[in-house]
Swiss-Prot record:
CDD domains: GST_C_Pi (cd03210), GST_N_Pi (cd03076). This is Glutathione S-transferase 2. Residues 1-78 form the GST N-terminal domain. Appears to play a central role in the parasite detoxification system. It comes from Onchocerca volvulus. It catalyses: RX + glutathione = an S-substituted glutathione + a halide anion + H(+). Its EC number is 2.5.1.18. Pfam families: GST_C_3, GST_N.
């Protein structure tokens, strides 16, 4: 099966998908386009949106739908209904945090960055710290010893927030250890080192 993932030349909404594909050693074409070129091809995509995954000749958009599609195909979606629901819940929480993050990044970076770091982020991270502790005492992955698509979403969210504030995880030992555990996975380590050396932007406006 051939895959092509089309997105802008940033991390953004596509990065958890890239991490999934890289870590699972799934071959794909990483199609990165310039923002200025998007208007001329926008009509080609469902909802006029990116990222877009081509699974053979099928086009899939919406980043969460893409992740769950891949998770079902490669058995990273939990082993039963409750596990699937649990990681869905986790990912929805990650999405909620990301909405708050992107609102600050794109709409009020200069005035809201410090209040976001000091007043909003700690409470949000505390929720994930508590939830992570419910499986295996938080000493491994979200589902314990089994990786799922939610691990890639959480890892990326923690990573971009550490760029925003390098000390944001200092009071959350389970999240900090989880982040390092994911970062040390061999394929992710190699990918992230190359990405970071290339200084790939996190967001489309250059702010991070």
């Amino acid at each position: 099966m051939s895959y092509k993932l089309t997105y802008f030349s940033i991390r953004g909404l596509a990065e958890p998908i890239r991490l999934f594909l890289v870590d699972q050693d799934i071959k794909f074409i990483d199609d990165r386009i310039a923002k200025d070129d998007f208007s001329s091809i926008k009509s080609q995509f469902q909802f006029g949106q990116l990222p877009c995954l081509y699974d053979g000749d099928q086009q899939i958009v919406q980043s969460g739908a893409i992740l769950r599609h891949l998770a079902r195909k490669y058995n990273l979606n939990g082993e039963n209904e409750m596990e699937t629901t649990y990681i869905d819940m986790f990912c929805e929480g990650v999405r909620d945090l990301h909405v708050k993050y992107t609102r600050m990044i794109y709409m009020a970076y200069e005035t809201e960055k410090d209040p976001y770091i000091k007043s909003i982020l700690p409470g949000e991270l505390a929720k994930f710290e508590k939830l992570l502790a419910t499986r295996g005492n938080g000493r491994n992955l979200i589902l314990g010893d089994k990786i799922s698509y939610a691990d890639y979403a959480l890892f990326e969210e923690l990573d971009v927030h550490q760029i925003l504030d390098p000390h944001c995880l200092d009071k959350f030992p389970l999240l900090k250890a989880f982040h390092q555990r994911m970062k040390d996975r061999p394929k992710l380590k190699e990918y992230c080192e190359k990405r970071d050396a290339a200084k790939v932007p996190v967001n489309g406006n250059g702010k991070q």
